[in-house]
Amino acid sequence: MSVMLVDDLTLIKKLGKGVFCEVYLTSKQGSKERYATKKIDKKFASNPKAKKYIDNEITILKDIDHPNIVKLYDVKETSQFFYLVTEYCNGGDLSSSLEDYQDKYNKPFPEEIVQYLMKQIVSAIRYLHKKTILHRDIKLDNILINYDTEEGQRKNNLLKQK
């Protein structure tokens, strides 16, 4: 039996928890497409500063379209929560990927992969800056990897071969 998170979103599993939200892996009922759905408690949003932060995040995500920035697909709302339905990045965060690779192979990421990742990160930052958007929390934990793209699959296979 599937558990509904909100509307037509089926809960698959909890991915993580932040200061003011929880993130779930979800799918639309009857679809194999997967999403990362951020569930934000409206109690947090009752603080004007927090509400402004949430509104800004939604406005920015709706306005941007770049292959290296997570896409916002939908915003849902109930009496208790806001739900931001975004692209799911199945590779996790860069910090964990670096640690896992180091643990498994006892060496750092191959230089070719580092160069590839840096190119993608710089491309995303350049895009945001051209739109006069400043990301104030760039860190390895906030850089997500998606292996579902053709390029992502090639890089993942390369990592496994090194």
Predicted feature locations:
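A short, aromatic-enriched beta-strand patch in the conserved N-lobe beta-sheet
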Residues: 74-75
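Conserved N-lobe ATP-binding subsite of Hanks-type protein kinase domains
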Residues: 22
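Activation segment signature within eukaryotic-like protein kinase domains
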Residues: 117-118
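Conserved N-lobe loop of protein kinases adjacent to the ATP-binding glycine-rich P-loop
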Residues: 27-34
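Catalytic-loop of the protein kinase fold
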Residues: 129-146
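Conserved short submotifs of the Hanks-type protein kinase catalytic core
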Residues: 80-93, 97
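AlphaC helix of the protein kinase catalytic domain
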Residues: 95-109
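Conserved N-lobe beta3->alphaC-helix segment of eukaryotic protein kinase catalytic domains
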Residues: 34, 39-64
